[in-house]
Amino acid sequence: MKIKNSLKALKGRHRDNRVVRRKGRIYILNKTNPRFRARQG
């Protein structure tokens, strides 16, 4: 999982990316291609 300051650019890298908020953190999750996962930090 990548940790990035801004997820806006990462969101558009794959069409299945989803932006999810969990426990105050923002994640990008992708079930079809998990290597696109990221967390804002």
From Swiss-Prot:
Q: Which domain of life is it from?
A: Bacteria
What Gene Ontology molecular-function terms does this entry list?
structural constituent of ribosome
Query: Pfam families given for it?
Result: Ribosomal_L36
Sorted alphabetically, the keyword list is: Ribonucleoprotein, Ribosomal protein
InterPro entries given for it? Ribosomal_bL36, Ribosomal_bL36_sp, Ribosomal_L36_bact
Q: Name one GO cellular component term.
A: ribosome
Q: List, in alphabetical order, the GO biological process terms annotated in this UniProt record.
A: translation
Family to which this protein belongs: Belongs to the bacterial ribosomal protein bL36 family.
- Record's protein name: Large ribosomal subunit protein bL36
Task: Name the source organism.
Answer: Bartonella bacilliformis (strain ATCC 35685 / KC583 / Herrer 020/F12,63)
Read off the lineage from the record. Bacteria, Pseudomonadati, Pseudomonadota, Alphaproteobacteria, Hyphomicrobiales
